[in-house]
Structures are given as C-alpha cells and as structure tokens.
Amino acid sequence: MTTEHLRFLKKIRRRRRMVVFLRILILFLFLLQWEICADTGVVDSFIFSSPSRIVTCFLKMTEDGSVFHHIGITLYETLVSFLLVTLTSILIAILLWCFHGLSEILDPYMVVLNSLPKSALAPLLIVWLGANTTTIVVAGMSVAIFGSILNLYTSFSTIDQEKIRLIYTLHGKRRHALTKVVLPGSIPAIISNMKVNIGLCLVGVIIGEFLAARSGLGYLIIYSSQVFKLDWLLMSICILCIIAVLLYAIINLIEK
C-alpha cells in the first residue's frame, strides 16, 4: 500500500469522524437550546415539554414496563408488515416481469393505488377487518407495497438486455434469466427499496394504531394528546425517531 493511498484512507476516516461529530453536535445544541428555552420560560414547558421532562417521563414508565410493551407492539407490527411487503412486492414484481402483457394491463391500477392517501383507507380497513392487529399490519403494508412493486418491476425491466439475450443464446429459459441475471442484478435495488419500506411501514403502522389500537406508540400518541399529557406524546415521538434510525441502520448493515 503506497503512502498516497494511506494518506487518502486517513483523509476519508477523518472526514467520516467529522461528519459523525457534527451530527452529534447539532443534536446536542438543539436539545440544549430546547432545555434552556423551556427552563427560562421562552416557550411553555407544558405545551413544548423539555428533554429533561421527557427523560423523566420515560424513566417513570420503565418502572412498570408499560413503555416497553407499547414499543414491542409497534415493533412487532412494523416488522411483520415490512417482511410481508418485501416478500409480496418481490413476488409480484417477478410475476409482472415474467408476463409483460399483465404488467401493461395492471400498470395504471398500480399507479392509482400508489397515489391514494393511505390514511383515508384506514377507516375502511377497520370496517372490513375489525379493530385488531391484522388491520394495523395491513395499514402498514398499504403505505409501502404499491410503490415497492413499481420500483422493483422498473429495476427488473432495466437490467442489461444483452445479458438476458446471452442466456437465451445458450438455450436458457426465462427462469434462468430471472435467477442468473435479473434477481442478482437487482439486489442493490431490492436493498434500497427495503431502506425506504422500513420507514414507510412504520408510518403505516402508526396510522393504523391511531384508529384501531389499544396499545402501541401510535395509541400512546393519540391517548396522550386527548388527555394533554404532552410529555408522553413527545416521548413517544422521540422513541419513534430512535426506532426509525435503528431500523434503517440495521438494513444499512445488511447491505454492507
């Protein structure tokens, strides 16, 4: 390894450390400013709460374990909907790729379904499926699945056609083109899709919990807003932010 190469790697590591430091610094300054404004009365601490009050609220709720129950419910529903979206979208995208005529027929319907405001579907899901976990999981799926199918099908369709023709030249079948070229070539798109879907599924689950849950962080947000326990509300939002970051980091780790 040359000196120039070592110097370049050192520069990259230094830049990464600086990025991490600046991210932490921005978060720290924001929390510090928030705490100072709440303590000095610049903002109403009852309405806007403060970092110290949120931490105190979290610690109190850990004593009886209720906060972990709500977190566990939301995580379970999010992961189930995410796994179902990932598997279903891959299978349907494969089906559309295998039958091009079917994709031409269904394309406008997929676009329309993807454009629908999913929050408007949640009350209908409650009528159809009842106020239960299934409804919340389906609500989580509905936010992500149609866009995921469209993205994956587009990725499958834009694979290098020369490689596919080479498979056919060697007397391969369509299934060989799928397993040897299309799917391996689409792995980056699938991983990228998973990064987007994990956040969308979390959003969909929270929407479902707003309307059809008796536990979970979405339920806790609605309940705390109704009884003006804004410390609970902001604590739930902060926990959701942490969950979203951790889930994204896990997918990012899988990609590497």
Pin down the residues of each PLM region.
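Hydrophobic alpha-helical elements at and bordering transmembrane segments
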Residues: V67-I71, L75, I105-V112, L178, ...
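Short helix-to-coil transition segments within interhelical loops
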Residues: L116, F156-E162, L166-S186, Q226
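Periplasmic/extracellular loop-to-transmembrane helix junction in inner-membrane transport proteins
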Residues: I12, T40-L83
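Hydrophobic alpha-helical transmembrane segments of polytopic membrane proteins
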Residues: G218-E255
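Transmembrane alpha-helical segments of polytopic membrane transport and secretion proteins
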Residues: M1-L25, A249-K256
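Generic hydrophobic transmembrane alpha-helix motif, especially the helices
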Residues: V111-G147, T154-S155
